[in-house]
Amino acid sequence: MLEIGDLHVSYGQVEAVRGVSLDLQPGQIISVIGPNGAGKTTLLAAAMGLLPCRGTLRFEGEDLQGLDVEARVERGLCLVPEKRELFGELTVLDNLQLGAFAKRLRGDAMKKRLQSVYDRFPRLAERRSQRADTLSGGERQMLAVGRALMSAPRLLMLDEPSLGLAPLIVRDILAIVRKLREDGVSILLVEQNARAALESSDHGYVLETGEIALSGASAELASDSRVQATYLGGGTHDDD
């Protein structure tokens, strides 16, 4: 479904992602874990078309290189960014409607898509007229995911969805991620909370200083002594 091969991404003279290869099959949840500054956010930004890159980047067999962000959304990719990037002065409803912009939904089609999001996140329905900046952290993350779902993605990329959230809220958000997979949405999950990421995914990659250090089935990575020593001693939520 998503094929990333020998990907390189640079900021000026600094190469932030170096030769990364990753394969995501339909119906999978793939996690990418690693320390702050490892290049996780950069990897997602390149996949979404927000940063130029070199290497292979294909979605459902189509070369993504040269396609802008809107074109990638139209093809079924969507990114929930690390800081959620909501429009705080706008209502929950306004933010959700903006998520459907690339699909150009109108009338009944818009109402149907909104209802599908409200069915998944009843709290957003209750707060549809509230400004986004009045929501709690967990509600803002729900809104960020709901806005992404307005474009009906087949592949949803999530950047640090647990950032700044209490453990119980993290559990709820990751339960939503697993339910999305059951409903046919494939997931690329970037997390610094390695334990939560590996518990929620099928396959994992460990990214360190811009390179893949380890990869394998998530359960196997969780049992790896190197992963346990470095990443499972205690979760942190620093920005990437």
Please provide the spans of the model-predicted regions:
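Glycine-rich phosphate-binding loops of nucleotide-dependent enzymes
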Residues: M1-D240
